Structures are given as C-alpha cells and as structure tokens.
Amino acid sequence: MKGLVIKNTGSWYQVKTDDGQFIECKIKGNFRLKGIRSTNPVAVGDRVQIILNQEGTAFINEIEDRKNYIIRRSSNLSKQSHILAANLDQCMLVVTVNYPETSTIFIDRFLASAEAYRVPVKLVFNKVDAYNEDELRYLDALINLYTHIGYPCFKVSAKEGTGVDAIKKDLEGKITLFSGHSGVGKSTLINAILPGTKVKTGEISTYHNKGMHTTTFSEMFSVDGDGYIIDTPGIKGFGTFDMEEEEIGHYFPEIFKVSADCKYGNCTHRHEPGCAVREAVEKHLISESRYTSYLNMLEDKEEGKYRAAY
C-alpha cells in the first residue's frame, strides 16, 4: 500500500494512503540503519510504501525517490542531518525585521541550502503593521535586495490579514514548506490562510525579544486549489549540511554569476588577486550583507561545522 506522509511527531508518522485512509505508522528498526544519517529518515512530503500488520498497526518499509528536500544540520551538533520536508514545489520563509529580528545571515543560509537542493524560495516579510518608519525603510531595502537577486517577496500582516490573499493564490496546486524563526508569526499566517486549521500560536519573550516554540512537529495541511502547506517547528539557526567549500559560492546566484570573471578558477573570493566578486562588492553590485553571509559559511567549513553526508 502506498501513501503520502502528512505528519511526523518523531515517534510515529501519519500516512494518507492513495485510497484516502489515514494510517499511523512506525518505521522498522533496521530501516534506520540503511545509511541514512538523519534524525528523521522519513519526512513529511515523502511518498512511502507501508505494510499493515494483523494487529492493526503499520510499518513504513520503503521511501520512493525524492524530487528534492530541505535539509539542515541537526541542532544537537551531531553528525546527523534533519530533513525539514521532501518533494516540495516551493518554500516560503517567513521573516521579520523585528519582534524578533531575522538576520540576513539566517535568510542567506536558508536560501543557499534551498539552492543546493533545487527548491525555489519566496520570502514572506510579516508583521508590517508593527514596524516604525526606520524599520519599514529597512524592510523595503531587504525586499529590493532579494527581489533583484531573483527571490519573490511578499509584505504581509498575518494579524490584520494584509497581503494574505496574494499568498493564498500562490499556494494553488503546489506543495509549500513554511519555515522561519519561532515568533515570526508563521502559525498565525497559516491560520489566516486556513481559518479552520487552528495551528497553535505563541507569544514573544519580552526578555529576549525572541519567539517561543509552538509547533513541535511537522504537519501537512490541504489548501484550496489542490495545494498543500507543510508547517514546521520554528528554528533558531540554520546549520548547512554536506557542502564543500568550493560549492558554497554556487548557491549565491549573484556571486556565482560574477565569479566567472575571477582571475583564478578556484578563487574563494577572500584574498586572491583579480577577484571579480570582491570588486563587485566594493562597487556595490553585490550586497555587502550577502558577501558577509558567504564568508560566514566559509568560516563554518573551516571550523568543521559542516558535516559530511553518509
């Protein structure tokens, strides 16, 4: 029997079978040992084969080949990865310029990982109703930056419903992963898109100005127009997994494009003479914040923070 994984609690998986049943499944112990160094070898969005037992329980015994997935280093700094979701048509990264602030380094790490696994990303700038004039100017500068690179952007207020209809329309016929820091209003936005869903929402810690986790597992929801949303727990950081140093620049489209003009083919864009990328940064043709994010990821590689895939 085949089906789609629509929920993952860490201990069991809910599968919607091709004939419309909803079945809770486990994975067999030996399935975990098939060379998959991941905290969750089965992810929401996976197409799977399941076997029903006489006792009424079910096991996942096979995962179909994935079209793509979004992966990050496991938060416990082990040699394992964590797969956020699989078989995606797009991601929507929900970000805020304050309450809490989403750093450009976090945004760029997420974008680079999505580029590596060929998942299109759109940026959703939430809480536009809460910002002062300086924050709104900064917001517009970020939108100008990322739109120019090629990432579509939305301005929304999930709380007031502003801009939500444009996102709804963009979800039609697609499987979309929603991700972002805790506290950016991701769950509030999903509730605005799907009023009957009642995804749990949380408050902001006033001491740290950071969000508190409300979603504790990944889950898929149906949306109008034959689409699906995958809601994931809020993430604090985005440790990139299985990237070689020389590949990192490939996942920054504007850096990769300019790097063709570097004097040396193996230029790291840090100190080499004749570096077209550094020249473009100095001329403000490449954003300094994006270049900083690129260097930050190179530093991770040097410090051994990247993990090899197994």
From Swiss-Prot:
Enzyme class at the top of the EC tree = hydrolase
Swiss-Prot/TrEMBL GO biological process terms: ribosomal small subunit biogenesis
Q: Summarize where GTP binds, as residue positions.
A: 126-129, 180-188
Ordered alphabetically, the record's keywords are:
Cytoplasm, GTP-binding, Hydrolase, Metal-binding, Nucleotide-binding, Ribosome biogenesis, RNA-binding, rRNA-binding, Zinc
Organism of origin is: Bacteroides thetaiotaomicron (strain ATCC 29148 / DSM 2079 / JCM 5827 / CCUG 10774 / NCTC 10582 / VPI-5482 / E50)
Q: Which domain of life is it from?
A: Bacteria
HAMAP family in UniProt: GTPase_RsgA (MF_01820)
Could you cite one Gene Ontology molecular function of this protein? GTPase activity
How is this protein annotated for GO cellular component?
Answer: cytoplasm
Q: Where in the cell is it found?
A: Cytoplasm
Specify whether Iron-sulfur is a keyword of the entry: no
Against Pfam families, the record matches this protein to: RsgA_GTPase (PF03193), RsgA_N (PF16745)
Q: What gene name is given for the protein in this entry? A: rsgA2
Q: Could you confirm whether the keyword Ribosomal protein appears in this record?
A: no
Domain CP-type G: from-to ranges: 77-238
Q: What is this protein called?
A: Small ribosomal subunit biogenesis GTPase RsgA 2
Required co-factor(s) are: Zn(2+)
Q: Which PANTHER family match?
A: SMALL RIBOSOMAL SUBUNIT BIOGENESIS GTPASE RSGA, SMALL RIBOSOMAL SUBUNIT BIOGENESIS GTPASE RSGA 1, MITOCHONDRIAL-RELATED
Entry's PROSITE patterns? ENGC_GTPASE (PS50936), G_CP (PS51721)
